[in-house]
Amino acid sequence: MGTARWLALGSLFALAGLLEGRLVGEEEAGFGECDKFFYAGTPPAGLAADSHVKICQRAEGAERFATLYSTRDRIPVYSAFRAPRPAPGGAEQRWLVEPQIDDPNSNLEEAINEAEAITSVNSLGSKQALNTDYLDSDYQRGQLYPFSLSSDVQVATFTLTNSAPMTQSFQERWYVNLHSLMDRALTPQCGSGEDLYILTGTVPSDYRVKDKVAVPEFVWLAACCAVPGGGWAMGFVKHTRDSDIIEDVMVKDLQKLLPFNPQLFQNNCGETEQDTEKMKKILEVVNQIQDEERMVQSQKSSSPLSSTRSKRSTLLPPEASEGSSSFLGKLMGFIATPFIKLFQLIYYLVVAILKNIVYFLWCVTKQVINGIESCLYRLGSATISYFMAIGEELVSIPWKVLKVVAKVIRALLRILCCLLKAICRVLSIPVRVLVDVATFPVYTMGAIPIVCKDIALGLGGTVSLLFDTAFGTLGGLFQVVFSVCKRIGYKVTFDNSGEL
């Protein structure tokens, strides 16, 4: 077994070809030419630390993905990539190291294999994981950005800066989860996938492989679809315990689970314009993937072949487990074996039945919870709409009152304006006229006696005139009569006073 491991190690030390990776300096903003792998060209905020280095992973002279690497934990914090495509089969696995992580003064700017780095890099392995750290351990090099999702012939993903310790079973389930999510849930709901930004990362635990490389407590994935008018963002978490399945979370909730509470995507991947219908479709597929994973785990746990040798040995009688060669021991073992097999069969049947019952109850509970969540969501939406309508009316009341007050003030101003106009017109009349109008009653009252006097004098004169006229007329008549009488023989003399 040791020989096979050393042969495998020798095969991993093969020439890297055109594979390279550039260590981005602290003075450079972002990840340099690898900023294109981040939404809006902006790496996650809040993850900067002295022990973190930025790497622009390249292959064949082109950028492939970006990695933020922790020199303290010797595992990647996250890797960022876009639009994954299936990789060609038969590519050779060549695990490489980054020389400038351990030796900043190194002239080697490309990733090289560990065998070459031993003689050319000072303090190799002081800040990054090496292939030898994984030898004789229960862990394998698990890629955050899997080779199976890369179309690079030179396999840029086979760098130790893109790997973290994973058990074989967890690594297999993690890769299956990534393939299922990318092929069935994420890429189909993001157009052609060209606008799909992916972040995969780790959260280290306190346990370390050979007291050097931190084993992840859980791994996570965050996806941002930047399709105009139909974008979305989702997060996923998978704990390294064998019994755990991948969990879907909102990006905001995922950020709270990570150290330093970072912001993974600028403005949360256009949160205000996200397409909720596409997110619902993604969650439906994710639920199917989770159910499939539970089914696979249930089948594995119920299989007799999956039991360990230690569990089988505990069911054997002491004579058989000790390998007694006595006839009595063999006889007892022969007699006890059928009962032990029967007990094992009953045990596995009971366990399988219980697991299926629990799984059935879990499915029923999940459906009930989903129904309750749907009802609560609709009730909440209706309540919010109701209060929004009431709020709009309440908010509009002050505005309407202000409009009425404004109209009243406007009417009062019009009345005041009319009064001012009347006053101005009155004030524009000459003062003499106003005095005459004011003194008219006085003059009128003072002229009444004079007018009455004049009227009386006029009436007296008229009466006197009438009397004079009457007497003159009578005198004239008498004069005529006397004249006639004189002519006819009567002589009557009158003096001037009219006496006979």
From Swiss-Prot:
Q: Where found, per UniProt?
A: Secreted
Which residue intervals are annotated with compositional bias (Low complexity) in the record?
297-317
Q: Give the UniProt record's GO annotations in the biological process aspect.
A: innate immune response
Q: Which domain of life is it from?
A: Eukaryota
Question: Where do the segments described as Disordered lie?
Answer: 293-323
Q: Could you cite one Gene Ontology molecular function of this protein?
A: nucleic acid binding
Q: Which Gene3D superfamilies match?
A: Extracellular Endonuclease, subunit A (3.40.570.10)
Q: List, alphabetically, the GO terms of the cellular component aspect.
A: cytosol; extracellular exosome; extracellular region; membrane
Family designation:
Belongs to the DNA/RNA non-specific endonuclease family.
Annotated protein name in UniProt: Endonuclease domain-containing 1 protein
- What's the source species for this entry? Homo sapiens
* Gene name in the database record: ENDOD1
